[in-house]
């Protein structure tokens, strides 16, 4: 029979000089593209230098997106080859540094964005960019004509952001009180184990009672309740959690957590005939806000109009539209409590040595799309042992109901 013939051939090959060749060929049939759980002691050595986890919330988000990618990047330190060219990360750092330095100039003079003049925006921004340009990838933004054009786009984006900040400040009762505010958030994972999250909040605005945390973005990400609950978008809510556990800010109530868009991505902008760069204007922010029209109109007196900077709308009686991205004060508290549980769960998985090749798939988005380690992990959804971690779509309404249930369960219906 055919089976008997193959068995006889296999026995013959194993008995002579073809044995090693046959074993190497058959190994491919037995290969499983998986990553075994690391021994706990090894995991702690790789991920917890000094015996304790001390890192950013972004790291835990990255771990949630793909444990194996995290292992390669932060565990054994596999790095991408540096081309020497400025990239989107460098563009973001350029704009972040510029906005921070301009804000520090105003802060040193006890002034707000609303008080900056056109002349100051022009002159101070020029001085700042002259100082920070050489620091970007060994002056990569001055290397050739293409790089110089990129810098022109970035400089225009920087000035445009300053003008928008000034206009928003003029129609807001909130003041910017901190920029790149450092925080250290220690969380107890168990009675005998804890970890510390560190980071910098790009901007904190407050009216004395309420606080808005802001993160500058050169892209246009959307802040999603579903992604927060799935552990994929924990940055902003962790900022609010950190403020609530810091002595000088613990009494501030959440007014908003939002991304502020810095438009003008160089490689997506074509050179117009007159040689002057331009950028398509879109919405200014994206976030989740407090369901309190008085607070929101203090944050932005033009909210709900074409001149508003925050994405909320109102009905005729003045209340906030149900379709707006808002939470009640109680729901914000519940979300912070759940976020702490999510962070603990991610830390516990990491600490236990779980490094599965199991990337998330959120709609059409997956970390595999931009992962530099594809040739190492060789993830292939066609293999039976490889599969995506699919993210379920849960409506904001359902999540709000879950937050209400969480508050009742904790007996915290009232702040």
Report each predicted region and the residues it spans.
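Structural signature of nuclease core domains in nucleic-acid processing machines
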Residues: 1-415
